[in-house]
Amino acid sequence: MHWYRKILNQQVSGLHRSNLKNQGQFAKKRIANGYEQPHNVKYWSIGNENYGAWEIGAKEADEWSRLVLESAKMMKHVDPTVQLSAAALNDPNWNLKLLQKAGNFLDWISIHVYFDGLQNVFDYAPSDYETMMGRTGKIAGSISRVRGTLAMLGLEKKIKIAYDEWNPRGWHHPGIHTNLGYGLENDEYLKVRDKNDTNSTYTMADAVFTACFLNECIRNCDVVQMANFAPMLNTTGPIYTYDGGNVKRST
């Protein structure tokens, strides 16, 4: 269990450094580096997509829920004012185990959604307008499943939903999850990946889908209280910057 304790210590050390005035070695290191006052960071997320095999540190639901519980207990002990979220997804089974174990220590449930699976294909071909409009029907169901799990456990008044990563498009990086890269050399792979930057492919489909997603969040604003478009700049972001200026994409 030494590795387990080490993970917890690493998580809490960041909170010490950020939010404590002068207690402990990490707060003192912050002061020594020129930041006398604490940063008082309010929102902290435990983990990132730890349900996914593409993540280093992926966990099964039972193991993950235990790690979240112990992390949250330690972090709340260090600073009871912080707001904590934990990596989850639109899967009632995963969320149920997480919330049953750690729900009393969490303030948010963190969900990432990308609706056009460009991360899974080699050829860069964003879905057409009709396909994306068909996918708007998945938005309400995505929210209602999570809301239902919270309600079942009596946590709908305590825990809010944070879509702290969402985008109509997945990230186009073919083969990166499997480390295969389709046999491409580095320079070839980068050319394929950089097709994300092709501004002409961002169309009204992106804009309308984005509007539908945000409207559904507003309809459920009693529980959905965070929705962060990811990324904001370049790649699949709504703003593309280059040496000559910037492009505001249709999103």
Residue ranges and their predicted role:
Residues 1-124, 144:
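N-terminal catalytic cores of secreted or lumenal carbohydrate-active enzymes
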Residues 3-6, 55-66, 97, 130-137, ...:
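Alpha-helix capping and helix-loop boundary segments enriched in small/acidic/polar residues
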Residues 19, 102, 150, 221, ...:
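Active-site catalytic pocket residues across diverse enzymes, especially alpha/beta-hydrolases
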Residues 26-35, 68, 72-95, 137-169, ...:
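Aromatic-lined carbohydrate-recognition surfaces of secreted/lumenal glycan-active proteins
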Residues 27, 55, 130-133, 233-234, ...:
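Generic, ordered loop/turn and secondary-structure boundary motif
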Residues 43, 118, 133-137, 236-237, ...:
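Solvent-exposed, flexible loop/coil residues
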Residues 117, 121-198:
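A compositional/structural signature marking long, glycine- and acidic/polar-rich segments
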Residues 162-251:
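Aromatic/acidic polysaccharide-binding cleft in carbohydrate-active enzymes
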